[in-house]
From Swiss-Prot:
Residues 219-224 are annotated as: Selectivity filter part 2. InterPro entries: Cat_transpt, TrkH. It comes from the Bacteria. This is Trk system potassium uptake protein TrkH. One of its GO terms (biological process) is potassium ion transmembrane transport. Residues 110-115 are annotated as: Selectivity filter part 1. Residues 321-326 are annotated as: Selectivity filter part 3. Keywords: Cell inner membrane, Cell membrane, Ion channel, Ion transport, Membrane, Metal-binding, Potassium, Potassium transport, Transmembrane, Transmembrane helix, Transport. One of its GO terms (molecular function) is potassium channel activity. Coiled coil: none annotated.
């Protein structure tokens, strides 16, 4: 284990992250809301912390191994989340406890979208911008965004990319060099954000709301600058902009990269449609949106079919992309609709996207595995390999997906048990852990709108669940294996 080299890298990344505090400080200056001091203090403290980590180890530039990448990813997320709490603690309004600030910061960085803050409409613009900006930074994963500069630091970036990337096919690279992948991600991610902000602005949002919501829409984070979430605007055009860009953020970004490289060369739509996961993902979205829309109309929750489709598409997409935007009180929806929303959140979006959940590719492979087992019962001698497109999946790949599913269940019930010990009842604990572990945001029970009333200790458990969900279990759980720390 190259501990000193790892500390050096963490220090450099923390120093880079400290610079992000200057952006909301500039926003505070523009609006004159008095928040600049808190962000400048947070900037200085973060910069000092990064320097103290980096300087004693700055001569250690050993090449990282694969196992080192996992520790860097987890350590950086924990350190980053801790530093991200500083502005929230330094502000006089809102006045947050340490546990609440930790919860809010990790919810932003992991793009969960759950919140312990209320009265958003009356908060300083700079703190509202900061929450949105945190989700934008966390959307693609801080480490993936940083790998473009990792080669400049004297180490290779492949291990970090593999540890942070999501989805079971993450060993497949979209481009030969990881720095090129990261740069392409930056260009695409930033371009989509700008397009989303323009679309919001043209649809009637003011510039501040348009920029803020573009951050949380592309990242599928779900934070809003208003207590009523996206429902504050109550406008169909804004709802459709939200739905479309959430879906774009829910697509595997390797497909976006391929489409970006193929501009002007071939039919871009074919580039997406030939991907089995994308076809499964889009088909499931259309089916779920249709069912939810018809259900909303059938239950009389909307006035006409157009409103049903508009609101059904938004609410279903928000849950399935684990974004966290809400226009309905989920806890008071008919059980059938609520169940569909929960199922969609469990499935999530595509691997390699900004969404949470199990991911569409894993769901597709598990479905094919179940189908094969059922056919094997009928034809015991049948040899039927599982294929995704033209690729035949190795047994090891299928085993890893089942292992992920089992780990997901174990972590879920472990967190539920821990939250119950913190004082929450079973139903609320199950709903809250589901919301945080899948990074979906809205919970069930009394936390369906805000986590402000949960015990302080439970907020720390939820923060752990968010990190587990964001790093897809294994990247974090592997650190608890004793053999990981052996030479």
């Amino acid at each position: 284990m190259r501990i000193l080299s790892i500390i050096r890298i963490i220090g450099i990344l923390v120093m880079c992250f400290s610079g992000t505090m200057l952006v909301p400080a500039f926003v505070a200056l523009i609006y004159g809301d008095g928040g600049g001091k808190a962000f400048m203090q947070a900037f200085m403290l973060s910069l000092i912390a990064g320097t103290l980590l980096w300087w004693p180890c700055h001569h250690h530039k050993q090449e990282l191994r694969s196992r080192d990448g996992f520790l860097i990813v987890v350590a950086f997320w924990l350190v980053l989340g801790s530093l991200a709490t500083l502005p929230l603690l330094l502000f006089d309004s809102p006045h947050l406890t340490i546990a609440s600030a930790v919860f809010e910061a990790f919810s932003g960085l992991t793009t969960t979208g759950a919140t312990v803050m209320t009265g958003l409409d009356n908060l300083p613009k700079s703190i509202l911008f900061y929450r949105q900006f945190l989700q934008w930074l966390g959307g693609m994963g801080i480490i993936v965004l940083a790998v473009a500069i990792i080669p400049l630091l004297g180490i290779g970036g492949t291990q970090l990319y593999r540890a942070e990337s999501s989805g079971p096919l993450k060993d497949q690279k979209s481009l030969p060099k990881i720095s090129e992948v990261a740069k392409a991600l930056w260009i695409i991610y930033a371009s989509l954000t700008v397009l989303c902000a323009i679309a919001y602005w043209l649809s009637g949002m003011n510039l501040f709301d348009a920029i803020g919501h573009s951050f949380s829409t592309i990242s599928n984070g779900g934070f809003s600058t208003h207590d009523a979430s996206i429902g504050y605007f109550n406008q169909a055009s804004i709802y459709w902009v939200t739905t479309i860009f959430m879906l774009i953020g829910g697509v595997n970004f390797s497909l976006h990269i391929s489409a970006f490289l193929a501009l002007g060369k071939r039919n871009i739509w074919r580039n997406y449609w030939k991907d089995p996961e994308f076809r499964f993902f889009l088909t499931m979205q259309i089916i779920f949106i249709g069912i939810v829309s018809l259900s909303l109309y059938g239950y009389g929750l909307v006035s006409d079919i157009n409103e049903a489709v508009t609101k059904g598409a938004l609410q279903l997409t928000s849950m399935s992309m684990t974004a966290g935007y809400t226009i309905f009180d989920i806890d008071n929806l008919p059980p059938f609709i609520g169940l569909l929303l929960v199922i969609s959140a469990v499935i999530g979006g595509c691997g390699g996207s900004t969404t949470g959940g199990l991911k569409a590719i894993r769901t597709l492979i598990l479905w094919k595995q179940i189908d094969r087992e059922l056919h094997s019962l009928i034809h015991p001698n049948l040899v039927q390999p599982i294929r995704i497109g033209k690729n035949r999946l190795a047994p090891r790949m299928i085993e890893s997906i089942w292992a992920f599913f089992i780990i997901f269940i174990l972590v879920y019930w472990g967190c539920v048990f821990a939250v119950i010990l913190c004082g929450m009842n079973t139903f609320d604990a199950m709903g809250a852990v589901f919301a945080t572990l899948t990074n979906a945001g809205p919970g069930l029970g009394f936390i369906h709108e805000s986590f402000i009333g949960v015990p302080e200790s439970a907020k720390l458990v939820f923060s752990f669940a968010m990190i587990c969900g964001r790093l897809e279990m294994f990247s974090l759980i592997v650190l608890f294996i004793p053999s990981y720390w052996k030479k």
